[in-house]
Amino acid sequence: MAVKDRYMSKIKQETKPWIKRFGRLGYFAFGGVFILLGVLAFMTAAGAGRAKDSSGALQTLSRMPYGSLLLFFIGIGLIGYVIWMVLSAIKDTEGHGNSRRGLSRRIGNFFSAAVYTSIAWNALRFVFGQGDGGTSEQTWSAYVLAQPFGQWLTGLTGAGFIVFAIVQFMKGVRAAFMKEFDTSKMNKQMICITKNTGRAGNIARAIIFSAIGYFLIKTAMTADPDDTRGFDGALAELAQQPHGKLILSILALGLILYGMYAIMKGIYQHMTWEK
């Protein structure tokens, strides 16, 4: 216990206040992206469009009134989220430690930083009128399949998505994420709201990621990049199943709740190094 206290004390001394504020802003932007994805998925379920991934959602937002201004704040906010994730991976600013589980979470934060760097870049590209130049999942998978051991790499990536989905699902069911919140600053109603939104949101995200993993494994088995589905493709496939519109509506609500959960995490995240 004394060793851990000294470890957290070192983190507390090294973490600058502006970095923590920037990280909180990042969670707000992170949550905003998922709320936008959920709203667009709802529109798809209602027959008013097609499910979109983050790039498609940003493109839609760019065409709305004041969309460029919102995209600017999302882009800057996500840069804050990326910085926070990188620091969490390298400096362990969230105090995960050096155990096997702690290191796996820190590595996961590094990959999360890579993904949201791309989304932040796309958001700012739309702000400056240089968007709509993304590369499709099929193009990427075709490139990977053409490499030595490409099918194995694609299959392992799919398996990674499914493993992540299982972890995310269990995290939602058990409400294990509540350990990340400073509940001393929350009233009972806010704790209840956070727990329920976090549960629903994490489970919804797990279902979508498991679908993406399934299609990647299918791509590896058939060696056909057309079988690959990204975020939007996975939602579109789910919508085509029996009761698909109902399923998509539930997942859309889950994405919105996940966004709300992320915003609350930005407000109440339990930072043990804060005074």
From Swiss-Prot:
Primary subcellular site in the record, as a coarse category: membrane
Keywords of this entry: Cell membrane, Membrane, Transmembrane, Transmembrane helix
Source species, domain of life: Bacteria
Signal peptide (UniProt feature, chain positions): none
Residue intervals passing through the bilayer: 25-45, 70-90, 107-127, 149-169, 203-223, 247-267
Keyword Magnesium: no
Location(s) in or outside the cell: Cell membrane
KW Cell wall biogenesis/degradation (keyword) present: no
One GO term describing the cellular component: plasma membrane
Membrane topology: Multi-pass membrane protein
Record protein name field: Uncharacterized protein YxxB
Protein's gene: yxxB
